[in-house]
């Protein structure tokens, strides 16, 4: 107890995923690219994750979307990242080329 407030030493896990996407051939401008990326980012945010376009910013035919989630249990982080990956993979307008995932615990540097 610190200053009359109970302090928890609970665990915290952070998970990240970066989705590398191939956009359709008609994505020849940044405006067209945004028309594909924005709905995917909005759909990902329904999983209560932070989501943003994080790479390939100047490439019209590619996009990288990153997500991050924090939870008290590693299993929950994995479940949320799995759900995000399924959502992106199921989008018929883009092709999911690769996924890079990381899970960090409180003891990771």
Where are the regions that the model predicts?
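Short, charge-patterned binding micro-sites
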Residues: 51-73
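C-terminal structural segments of small proteins and small subunits
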Residues: 71-109
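Short beta-strand elements
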Residues: 47-55, 95-102
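Active-site-flanking beta-strand signature of metal-NTP-handling nucleotidyl enzymes
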Residues: 15-21, 66-67
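Short beta-strand/turn micro-motifs at beta-sheet edges
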Residues: 2-10, 51-57
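Short amphipathic alpha-helix segments
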Residues: 31-50
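Short, flexible turn/loop "capping" segments at secondary-structure junctions
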Residues: 10-16, 58-62
């Amino acid at each position: 107890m610190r200053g009359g407030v109970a302090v928890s030493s609970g665990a915290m896990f952070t998970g990240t995923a970066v989705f590398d996407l191939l956009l359709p051939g008609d994505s020849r401008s940044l405006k067209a690219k945004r028309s594909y990326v924005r709905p995917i980012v909005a759909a990902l945010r329904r999983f209560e994750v932070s989501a943003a376009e994080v790479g390939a910013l100047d490439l019209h035919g590619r996009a990288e979307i990153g997500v991050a989630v924090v939870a008290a249990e590693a299993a929950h982080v994995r479940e949320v990242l799995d759900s995000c990956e399924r959502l992106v993979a199921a989008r018929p307008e883009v092709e999911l080329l690769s996924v890079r995932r990381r899970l960090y615990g409180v003891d990771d540097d």
